């Protein structure tokens, strides 16, 4: 079709151009009928959703490509120009290509950003205005599926069985619709619920390097929210490695968060998480919009009364892609080369992640800090929106304590006696005080040994080591690796256990009794068993 449309470039008269456009639409329709009969390829499967809209496309204005520079495509129209953020469609090497209008130039020309590769486009090629913005499918049919930035399935399982779609560009909820109540979202993970609790509708920054358990923690959060709250999750891979995205998909199936369509006659019914990927190799337009696509799906669940967990990995790459798009559009960069609209772009995303009177979206965002510089504009802009941070420590992971959350570096604005209650706040402060004192004594212990400590400090060190181990917890999604069944611990049990540890109620139990258990009752049983084994 590209050649057929391109050959009309030499036509000089307006009537000839219109005739070529009409013939191009007819050829496009015949191609779509042929592709509907072949579902073996994910690209052809994806094109089903695209060709379903051909009638709408034909009603919109028809333009012509005038210039292609990387991911930027200039399109000229004869009449009225498409609105800013409108989606334009053309065909590139047999595949559907979506262009998003970014600027209105002179001479009836718009500048657009491509959502896929522009290799193969030619000047004079016809482009159709869809008269709407980029829309993605929403609803329960998206659960268990992998989609790209424009909502096409890329998991080779067939089309997404829904007719409900929503524009990726939505306004933040009105003030009157937002919920002002401060409520904890219990995750069932002891270290998070006690020391850095998440709030419904809150935003959490997840800091962690490679191999410290970030992916496992993300998967456990998805698993626990789904089981304890009956809620859904959405994972947006922004600039992700393809390998990591593939691993996450299959790990979710193995841990029963999602249903394997191959084992369920092609159906993903019963799945709890939708995945939207804009991979590292994709153009900046796709990486800059994929977070909005994922958020749109999460918003639809929230508006249906669900408590949704929304993951973004990595929020820095969202900013990075925005900087690339800004440079391609010719904007003058601001500090450190970032786009001048950095704060606006970040605010437009973050302000949509909020609770309403019907449901909530809780966001967990992985954040990369360039060169460990927290003053870099990208992470600094993100920090302004965070309600809590969960820091994963390599030194804790080296001790074999998982989840490897640093109890002293992690914090939450929800840890306030007016929100969590006096007892919870007091116990959390006692735990942090003991661990902080233990950290300050570690140099003395390393040089002089435990014998040089006072009796009071020896007692404190013993409690601190038990607290450290009690902060560990077997995860459901890691059962195949640990051999231990996962534990979801209620908040009341968590507070009860750490309150007793701080008070010295369990000073007589061995440290090993507190390692990789759920509630304090399990630790007591394990301790009695260990003491009996040692006595025999």
UniProtKB/Swiss-Prot annotation:
It comes from the Bacteria. GO terms for molecular function: ATP binding; ATP hydrolysis activity; proton-transporting ATP synthase activity, rotational mechanism. SMART domains: AAA. ATP binds at residues 208-215. One of its GO terms (cellular component) is plasma membrane. Residues 30-49 have a biased composition (Polar residues). Residues 1-57 are annotated as: Disordered. Its main location: membrane. Keywords: ATP synthesis, ATP-binding, Cell inner membrane, Cell membrane, CF(1), Hydrogen ion transport, Ion transport, Membrane, Nucleotide-binding, Translocase, Transport. It catalyses: ATP + H2O + 4 H(+)(in) = ADP + phosphate + 5 H(+)(out). It is an enzyme of class 7 (translocase). Gene3D superfamilies: 2.40.10.170, Bovine Mitochondrial F1-atpase, Atp Synthase Beta Chain, Chain D, domain 3 (1.10.1140.10), P-loop containing nucleotide triphosphate hydrolases (3.40.50.300). Its EC number is 7.1.2.2. InterPro entries: AAA+_ATPase, ATP-synt_VA_C, ATP_synth_F1_bsu, ATPase_a/bsu_AS, ATPase_alpha/beta_chains, ATPase_F1/V1/A1_a/bsu_N, ATPase_F1/V1/A1_a/bsu_N_sf, ATPase_F1/V1/A1_a/bsu_nucl-bd. Belongs to the ATPase alpha/beta chains family. F-type ATPases have 2 components, CF(1) - the catalytic core - and CF(0) - the membrane proton channel. CF(1) has five subunits: alpha(3), beta(3), gamma(1), delta(1), epsilon(1). CF(0) has three main subunits: a(1), b(2) and c(9-12). The alpha and beta chains form an alternating ring which encloses part of the gamma chain. CF(1) is attached to CF(0) by a central stalk formed by the gamma and epsilon chains, while a peripheral stalk is formed by the delta and b chains. Produces ATP from ADP in the presence of a proton gradient across the membrane. The catalytic sites are hosted primarily by the beta subunits. This is ATP synthase subunit beta. It comes from Bartonella quintana (strain Toulouse).
């Amino acid at each position: 079709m590209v050649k057929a449309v391109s050959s009309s470039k030499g036509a000089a008269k307006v009537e000839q151009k219109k005739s070529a456009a009409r013939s191009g639409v007819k050829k496009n329709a015949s191609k779509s009928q042929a592709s509907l009969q072949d579902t073996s390829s994910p690209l052809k499967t994806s094109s089903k959703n695209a060709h379903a809209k051909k009638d709408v496309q034909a009603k919109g204005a028809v333009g012509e490509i005038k210039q292609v520079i990387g991911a930027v495509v200039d399109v000229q129209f004869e009449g009225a120009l498409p609105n800013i953020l409108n989606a334009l469609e053309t065909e590139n090497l047999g595949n559907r290509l979506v262009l998003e209008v970014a600027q209105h130039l002179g001479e009836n020309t718009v500048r657009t950003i491509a959502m896929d590769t522009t290799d193969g486009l030619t000047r004079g090629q016809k482009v159709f205005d869809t008269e709407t913005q980029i829309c993605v499918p929403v609803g329960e049919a998206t659960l268990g599926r992998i989609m790209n930035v424009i909502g096409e399935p890329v998991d080779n399982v067939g089309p997404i069985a829904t007719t409900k779609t929503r524009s990726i560009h939505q306004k933040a909820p009105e003030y009157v619709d937002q919920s002002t109540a401060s409520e904890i979202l219990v995750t069932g993970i002891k270290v998070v619920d006690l020391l850095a609790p998440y709030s419904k509708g809150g935003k959490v920054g997840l800091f962690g390097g490679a191999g410290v358990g970030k992916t496992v923690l993300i998967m456990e959060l998805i698993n626990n929210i789904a089981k304890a709250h009956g809620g859904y999750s959405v994972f947006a891979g922004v600039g992700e490695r393809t390998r990591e995205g593939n691993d996450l998909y299959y790990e979710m199936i193995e841990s029963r968060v999602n249903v394997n369509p191959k084992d369920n006659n092609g159906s993903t019914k019963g799945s709890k998480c939708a995945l939207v990927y804009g991979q590292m190799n994709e153009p900046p337009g796709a990486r800059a919009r994929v977070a909005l696509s994922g958020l749109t799906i999460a918003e639809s669940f929230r508006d249906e009364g669900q408590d949704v967990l929304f993951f973004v990995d990595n929020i820095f790459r969202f900013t990075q892609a925005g900087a690339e798009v800004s440079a391609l559009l010719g904007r003058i960069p601001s500090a450190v080369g970032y786009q001048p609209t950095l704060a606006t772009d970040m605010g437009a995303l973050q302000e949509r992640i909020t609770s309403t009177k019907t449901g909530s979206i809780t966001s967990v965002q992985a954040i990369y800090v360039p060169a460990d510089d927290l003053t870099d504009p990208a992470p600094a802009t993100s920090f302004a929106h965070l309600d809590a941070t969960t820091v994963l420590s390599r030194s804790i992971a080296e001790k074999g304590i998982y989840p490897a959350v640093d109890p002293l570096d992690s914090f939450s604005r929800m840890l306030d006696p007016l929100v969590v209650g006096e007892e919870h706040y007091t116990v959390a402060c006692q735990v942090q005080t003991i661990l902080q004192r233990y950290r300050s004594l570690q140099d003395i212990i390393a040089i002089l040994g435990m014998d040089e400590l006072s009796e009071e400090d020896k007692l404190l060190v013993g409690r601190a080591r038990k607290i450290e181990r009690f902060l560990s917890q077997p995860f459901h999604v890691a059962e195949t690796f640990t051999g231990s069944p996962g534990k979801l611990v209620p908040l009341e049990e968590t507070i009860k256990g750490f309150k007793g540890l701080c008070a010295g109620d369990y000073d007589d139990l061995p440290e090993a009794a507190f390692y990789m258990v759920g509630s304090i009752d399990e630790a007591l049983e394990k301790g009695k068993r260990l003491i009996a084994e040692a006595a025999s």
